[in-house]
């Protein structure tokens, strides 16, 4: 089955609070996944089709990359593309960021986290489904070392503002900027980012650093 066929059948939004996304998941043997498991890890939460990480992994072989995605067919297709490019510093994993992160990342040298264009869940009653929660921020504070960074991006101002406020509210993070970043810190754009910029629309970006303990 082609990547295109798989994407067509994937729902754009899934409810992360659904019971099936609360169940335990197996954790890979990272020594079999990554050629150099001790390399700094860049985690992309909600990686979708994974094209951002595919390009980043090729550009930065000295880092490892992990894409976490809740829509399983996208994970399968992304790993197939990775295999075709024979990248041993990249993996995609099915999971729920608000449930599985601590178990997944135990022992991995996490250094960078990106949360880019997450599902906005516009209706107020659905805000609890948004990926950035106080609990997620607290988990990332536990997993990131001092100097580790978090980069947030969204084309929805209210969503971007909410994400920034939640990281600001946690004492373990400090902003490394005083206003929205005009440019991405990465040489690679996500598919959504390209689409938004091609339409001449705004992207709201912010960066945080994990404070010293």
Swiss-Prot record:
Pfam families: Methyltransf_4 (PF02390). InterPro entries: SAM-dependent_MTases_sf, tRNA_(Gua-N-7)_MeTrfase_Trmb, tRNA_methyltr_TrmB_bact. Disulfide bonds: none annotated. S-adenosyl-L-methionine binds at residues 44, 69, 96, 119. The active site is at 119. Its EC number is 2.1.1.33. The keyword Zinc-finger does not apply. Pathway: tRNA modification; N(7)-methylguanine-tRNA biosynthesis. It comes from the Bacteria. It catalyses: guanosine(46) in tRNA + S-adenosyl-L-methionine = N(7)-methylguanosine(46) in tRNA + S-adenosyl-L-homocysteine. This is tRNA (guanine-N(7)-)-methyltransferase. It comes from Thermosynechococcus vestitus (strain NIES-2133 / IAM M-273 / BP-1). The lineage of its organism: Bacteria, Bacillati, Cyanobacteriota, Cyanophyceae, Acaryochloridales.
